[in-house]
């Protein structure tokens, strides 16, 4: 493995603050997680950063790891991958339920905050983003959702030629290995997608019964041909451990002599000769260094950082650049614009039946699930907290699903803006039902706040800015009302823990959403694909308009938000982007 620097992220298996299992079992789990153990990893085959490379990929996240594998597989090209965070040896990354810890860990998480939003009762939002090899896919809730066919057909309609559903479906099928609950395998791709419907908590049956009572569809998978309806979510795991892009793609790529990974590298700006990108200026080991690319520089730093790097390099709205003392290279007003994100809300209830709280809270339960995980890699620790849900139409007149629902057999308390380092199940049985409108129409911005590349960005989501988005919130709240009011779920409700959605009118649903909703961690669109610089940032081949040798490959190029979780389409996009890059080589 060629690696310029390895930073050890986890120094103690018994990390304080995450209290689902006792320390002794934390240590057992760490020791069993051999691929992600807390033992010190030595540096090997250290390579000088002054060496020339064909491709420099900035960001070893969900997209960057895929690119590294695909661009290096032929052996023709030398690939350098830069990551601002650490290598990601933490066992909390490997353990599926461990994201309760990484969600707040500043060693693994940028922990961004948005500007306060009047539309959300003056609140600032907490935006966790991965600062580690594997990116946000290393700290997310693992749900694997391709998106709906119309999402990608809309991409093409918006100017992203060649990104329609028929095309991207083939990329998904190439990329995936789908693992059935009985051990059957479909496909032969490096990314494992696990059916865990046989492991979910028994209380989920009340959700399925409620959906059936309302006449809502049932489906085996939101990723299948019939993807509308109640289902157990599929997740990215293999052998009971997280299967993120680093494990699936980068790990095998690093065995090749033509791939180098540098961690702890902060990209500062892109260097140009005329309008051609030729190098990237970075801060590495306390020194400013310049890394040259013989062919292309590829930004894969995500929807928050990719537009910032362009702006810091002189590509962005000219008045913004001038206001921060940056000499404009190209006036590109769409850089940082078109920001979209899912907003969601949870309704918490005390339950009349045992839930996951009864398993994860008491000491005996912690011991039992820890042993189950250590011995069989199964059970609650091998799952996401988001066990069930699906895509739904809020009313029969809708032609497409407009809501994504979540049903979680556990309740827990956190504090705003990531201030709390403990995620602890409540000391009574409880469950959560929540929703997110699938396709918001509001558009925000992400911009630099300074010419200092280390300064926090200015994130302005512009949430609920359209009447359509507000109507979709009410529709989602009404759908949850109907579900909770069914005989099946009403039997499960002991009492409410939040404002009781069951008695709310439309205005009250919207007001409650404004007061309590939060991001579902799916920001996209800030370097959107399109035909020209007049309507977008990159071409359908992901080349920055008007610039040579520079592409953006991550969720920032999505013309519109996909209907569900965004990690799967981000990896798909990178997989297909690699084909385009190699065609142009």
What label would you give each PLM region?
Residues 32, 36-53, 169, 175-226, ...:
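FAD-dependent oxidoreductase catalytic-site/capping-region signature
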Residues 65-99, 164-167, 305-331, 470-473, ...:
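Classical protein tyrosine phosphatase
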Residues 38-41, 45-173, 332, 342-351:
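N-terminal glycine-rich phosphate/pyrophosphate-binding loop and immediately adjacent elements
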Residues 156-277, 283, 346-367:
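Conserved redox-cofactor binding core of oxidoreductases
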Residues 74, 78, 86-88, 270, ...:
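Glycine-rich loop(s) and the adjacent beta-strand/alpha-helix scaffold that form part
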Residues 10-13, 30, 38:
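Cysteine-centered motifs
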Residues 57, 61-66, 198-199, 303-304, ...:
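Residue-level detector of alpha-helix initiation sites
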């Amino acid at each position: 493995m060629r690696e310029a620097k390895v930073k050890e992220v986890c120094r103690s298996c018994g990390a304080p603050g995450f209290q689902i299992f006792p320390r002794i079992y934390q240590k057992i789990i760490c020791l069993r997680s051999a691929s992600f153990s807390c033992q010190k990893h030595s540096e090997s085959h250290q390579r000088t950063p002054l060496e020339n490379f064909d491709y420099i990929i900035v960001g070893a996240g969900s997209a960057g790891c895929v690119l590294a594998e695909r661009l290096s597989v032929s052996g023709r090209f030398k690939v350098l991958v830069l990551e601002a965070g650490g290598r990601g040896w933490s066992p909390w990354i490997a353990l599926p339920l461990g994201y309760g810890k990484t969600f707040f860990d500043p060693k693994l998480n940028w922990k961004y905050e948005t500007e306060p939003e009047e539309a959300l009762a003056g609140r600032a939002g907490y935006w966790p983003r991965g600062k580690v090899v594997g990116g946000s896919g290393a700290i997310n809730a693992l749900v694997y959702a391709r998106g709906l066919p119309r999402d990608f057909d809309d991409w093409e309609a918006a100017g992203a030629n060649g990104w329609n559903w028929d095309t991207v479906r083939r990329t998904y099928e190439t990329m995936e290995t789908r693992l059935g609950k009985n051990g059957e395998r479909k496909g032969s791709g490096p990314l494992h997608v696990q059916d865990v419907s046989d492991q979910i908590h028994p209380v989920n049956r009340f959700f399925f019964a409620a959906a059936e009572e309302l006449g809502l569809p049932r489906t085996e998978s939101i990723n299948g041909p019939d993807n509308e309806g109640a289902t157990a979510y599929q997740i990215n795991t293999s052998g009971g451990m997280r299967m993120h892009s680093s494990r699936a793609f980068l790990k095998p790529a690093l065995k090749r002599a033509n791939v180098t990974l540098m961690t702890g590298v902060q990209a500062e700006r892109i260097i140009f000769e005329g309008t051609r990108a030729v190098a990237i200026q970075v801060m590495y080991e306390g020194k400013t260094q310049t890394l040259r690319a013989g062919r292309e520089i590829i930004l894969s730093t995500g929807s928050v950082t990719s537009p910032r790097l362009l702006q810091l390099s002189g590509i962005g709205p000219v008045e913004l650049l001038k206001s921060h003392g940056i000499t404009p290279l190209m006036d590109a007003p769409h850089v940082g614009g078109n920001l979209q994100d899912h907003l969601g809300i949870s309704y918490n209830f005390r339950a009349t039946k045992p839930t996951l709280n009864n398993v994860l809270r008491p000491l005996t339960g912690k011991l039992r699930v820890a042993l189950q995980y250590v011995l069989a890699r199964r059970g609650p620790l091998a799952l996401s907290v988001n066990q069930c849900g699906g895509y739904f139409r809020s009313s029969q007149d809708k032609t497409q699903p407009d809501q994504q629902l979540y049903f979680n057999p556990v309740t827990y308390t956190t504090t705003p803006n990531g201030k709390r380092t403990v995620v602890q199940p409540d000391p009574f049985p409880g469950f959560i039902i929540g929703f997110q409108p699938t396709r918001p129409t509001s558009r925000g911005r992400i911009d630099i706040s300074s010419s200092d590349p280390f300064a926090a960005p200015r994130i302005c989501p512009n949430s609920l800015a359209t009447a359509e988005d507000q109507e979709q919130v009410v529709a989602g709240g009404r759908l949850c009302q109907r579900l909770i009011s069914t005989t099946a779920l009403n039997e499960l409700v002991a009492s409410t823990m939040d404002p009781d959605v069951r008695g709310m009118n439309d205005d009250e649903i919207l007001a409650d959403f404004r007061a309590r909703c939060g991001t579902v961690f799916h920001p996209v669109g800030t370097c959107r694909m399109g035909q020209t610089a007049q309507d977008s940032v990159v071409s359908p081949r992901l080349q920055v308009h008007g610039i040579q040798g520079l592409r953006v490959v991550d969720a920032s190029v999505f013309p519109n938000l996909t209907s569900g979780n965004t990690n799967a389409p981000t990896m798909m996009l990178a997989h297909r982007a690699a084909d385009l890059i190699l065609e142009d080589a």
